[in-house]
């Protein structure tokens, strides 16, 4: 017996290696027949009769191809595996029944991805499995589909996630068929009656279904144990992941979801979607048969529509234009319960904790966190007093509550007094008929500067204005009358926007034209300087005699002669706004025009931040009534209690008629790139 093997071992070792490689290939081809063939002497194939194995360092030895993913046993042993299942190593060790793909450590951004979605071997069966997408489920549990043992222990080791598309029907309704248009876009044929809509899937004592998919027959699966819908299922959003160049299905799903959210972001919302205010979809679930009463297709009017979102009946609960008399289908969030004090109201525990994401061009209004299926009226659709009345009564007519959006929350939580009349910007385009007379206003500015300032400072201001005069001429020489009228309309429209900003901002703010005329002023600026808004805008005569001279506070006389302007004296019937140069002292005016010459046609986004001295508004009577003891008394008040309230702000600069401030200003240009207005913000230096 020992002599025969020695004689058989006489051939060259290459013959043994060839025989071993053939045996390995044969075993890989018959992976589904796990058995080990042995020679007559009890020695396994692939090894010689004397127990010697092929030399692993032999260059002629066939190399194994590296597997895409090792099995669980080879992964733990850090050994080379193969693509076949069961692999050769598990077959030799007798572990062929437990040979399955190992699970790799997922990246952080994939930690919430199901393991099945990351397995490359089941790319065509995880999402597009016809068994998974076409299993109907009756509520009485009469139809149950049991998977065989070979299917449960075959290619898919991990059970399919609980995202099977179940269609719940009443016992009195026949089971519908499910023809699929595409593997990722099933067409739902649903037939129901109003009676069926009144039954909630989350009502009393729901019977758990008896259908088990890819699992043991005796182990029931509860569809309510998982989430309401599977966000990792591309069929929910009509994704074609096979067309995306991603090795990882979850990465492709994330990319497709971002594209789905961005789809239609710039489109104008449709009438039905705007009124419905619900989440828009491009349609992965369509009604192909008789529609449910009160729930037509997405393109119909929302007056009798019940949106069917994400192909899940449980998410059939969304604000819609449901009529009060129609039966209501409760859904995810119960409307009333044992803990609810008011029927029909969401309890605190049941309310959602986040705003819904608008995934399509359905509406530009933010869905509210307190929205419910019965909230069918938005703030934009009802008068303001009706929303307040609904809040005070607790219940709206027909037991409905108005849909609370972000603007309505702002209005209802704040104590709103008399409502301001809504301004219409269209009136600007109707009222402006003539171009603004910038030439005459520049002449008025020049006359004022010559009348107030000494020759030296007048020359400095003139040089600054002369440096930008060629630019003004070059930009305006091609403009005709229509262009100048359009320029004034642009100015008034921009000023219309700034007025709301000034009223909402607590900083002393003024807006001037490029000539320096005051065009808009905030309340805080009037409190700080004493200049009334009507005086600054030219609606009342300007009786100020404070020019910032050295003899001003005590004597009441100016350092030079100055005749106060009034709208009647100069140009009868025409408003004469105050120039910015009348609000600043001499040095501040010179500094302003030097900075304006650099910024007017320079950096369009530039700004200037520096200090200045604002002149208080004082008439001749104010100057005569001012006494030194009053000034001393006010200074003592500052040392004791400081500045408080509007009266304290108004008394700043009482001593010398000047308020030292830090201010920041910038230049805004029009469509012709010409300086249009100057926006200035002041903060007093206390």
Curated annotation (Swiss-Prot):
This is Transcription activator of gluconeogenesis acuK. GO terms for cellular component: nucleus. PROSITE patterns: ZN2_CY6_FUNGAL_2. The gene is acuK. InterPro entries: ERT1_acuK_gluconeogen_tf (IPR050335), PAS_13 (IPR056751), Zn2-C6_fun-type_DNA-bd_sf (IPR036864), Zn2Cys6_DnaBD (IPR001138). CDD domains: GAL4. GO terms for biological process: cellular response to starvation; gluconeogenesis; positive regulation of metabolic process. Belongs to the ERT1/acuK family. Disulfide bonds: none annotated. It comes from the Eukaryota. Keywords: Activator, DNA-binding, Gluconeogenesis, Metal-binding, Nucleus, Transcription, Transcription regulation, Zinc. The keyword Transit peptide does not apply. Residues 177-222, 269-292, 362-378, 403-415, 544-570 have a biased composition (Polar residues).
């Amino acid at each position: 017996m020992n002599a025969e093997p020695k004689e058989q071992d006489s051939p060259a070792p290459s013959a043994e290696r060839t025989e071993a490689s053939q045996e390995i290939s044969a075993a890989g081809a018959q992976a589904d027949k796990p058995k080990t063939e042995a020679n007559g002497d009890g020695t396994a194939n692939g090894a010689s009769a004397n127990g010697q194995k092929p030399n692993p360092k032999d260059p002629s030895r066939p190399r194994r191809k590296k597997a895409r993913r090792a099995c669980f046993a080879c992964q733990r042993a850090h050994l080379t595996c193969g693509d076949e299942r069961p692999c050769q190593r598990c077959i030799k060790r007798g572990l062929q029944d437990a040979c399955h793909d190992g699970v790799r450590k997922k990246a952080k951004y994939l930690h919430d991805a199901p393991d099945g979605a990351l397995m490359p071997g089941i790319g065509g069966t995880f999402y597009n499995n016809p068994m998974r997408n076409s299993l109907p489920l009756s509520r009485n549990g009469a139809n149950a589909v049991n998977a065989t043992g070979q299917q449960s222990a075959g290619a898919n080791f991990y059970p399919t996630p609980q995202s099977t598309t179940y269609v719940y029907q009443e016992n009195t309704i026949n089971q519908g068929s499910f023809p699929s248009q595409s593997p990722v876009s099933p067409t739902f044929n649903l037939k129901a009656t109003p009676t069926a809509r009144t039954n909630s899937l989350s009502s009393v004592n729901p019977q758990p279904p008896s259908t088990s998919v890819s699992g043991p027959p005796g182990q029931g699966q509860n569809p309510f144990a998982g989430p309401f819908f599977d966000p990792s299922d591309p069929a929910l959003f009509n994704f074609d992941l096979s067309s995306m160049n991603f090795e990882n299905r979850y990465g492709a799903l994330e990319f497709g979801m971002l594209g789905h959210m961005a789809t239609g972001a710039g489109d104008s919302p449709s009438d039905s979607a705007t009124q419905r205010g619900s989440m828009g979809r491009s349609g992965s679930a369509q009604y192909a048969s008789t529609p449910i009463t009160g729930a037509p297709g997405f393109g119909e009017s929302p007056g009798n529509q019940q949106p069917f979102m994400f192909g899940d009946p449980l998410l059939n609960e969304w604000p819609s234009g449901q009529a009060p008399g129609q039966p209501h289908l409760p859904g995810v969030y119960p409307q009333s319960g044992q803990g609810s004090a008011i029927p029909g109201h969401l309890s605190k525990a049941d309310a959602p904790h986040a705003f819904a994401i608008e995934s399509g061009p359905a509406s530009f209004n933010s869905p509210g966190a307190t929205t419910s299926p019965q909230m069918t009226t938005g703030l934009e659709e009802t008068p303001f007093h009706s929303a307040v009345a609904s809040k005070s009564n607790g219940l709206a007519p027909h037991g409905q509550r108005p849909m609370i959006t972000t603007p309505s929350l702002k209005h209802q939580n704040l104590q709103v007094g008399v409502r301001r009349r809504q301004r219409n910007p269209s009136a600007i385009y109707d009222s402006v008929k003539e171009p603004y007379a910038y030439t005459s206003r520049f002449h008025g500015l020049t006359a004022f500067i010559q009348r107030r300032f000494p020759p030296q400072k007048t020359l400095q201001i003139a040089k600054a204005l002369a440096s930008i005069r060629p630019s003004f001429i070059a930009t305006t020489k091609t403009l005709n009358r229509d262009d100048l009228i359009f320029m004034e309309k642009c100015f008034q429209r921009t000023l219309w926007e700034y007025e709301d900003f000034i009223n909402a901002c607590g900083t002393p703010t003024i807006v001037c034209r490029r000539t320096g005329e005051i065009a808009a002023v905030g309340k805080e600026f009037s409190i700080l300087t004493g200049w009334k808004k009507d005086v600054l805008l030219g609606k009342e005569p300007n009786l100020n005699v404070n020019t910032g001279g050295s003899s001003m506070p005590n004597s009441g006389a100016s350092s030079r002669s100055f005749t106060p302007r009034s709208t009647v004296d100069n140009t009868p019937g025409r408003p004469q706004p105050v120039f910015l140069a009348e609000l600043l002292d001499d040095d501040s005016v010179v500094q302003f025009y030097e900075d304006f010459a650099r910024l007017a046609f320079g950096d369009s986004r530039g700004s200037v931040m520096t200090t200045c001295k604002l002149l208080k508004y004082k008439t001749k009577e104010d100057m005569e009534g001012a006494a030194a003891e009053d000034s001393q008394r006010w200074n003592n008040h500052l040392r004791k209690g400081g500045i408080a309230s509007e009266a304290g702000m108004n008394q700043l600069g009482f001593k010398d008629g000047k308020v030292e401030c830090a201010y920041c200003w910038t230049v805004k240009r029009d469509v012709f790139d010409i300086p249009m207005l100057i926006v200035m913000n002041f903060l007093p230096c206390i």
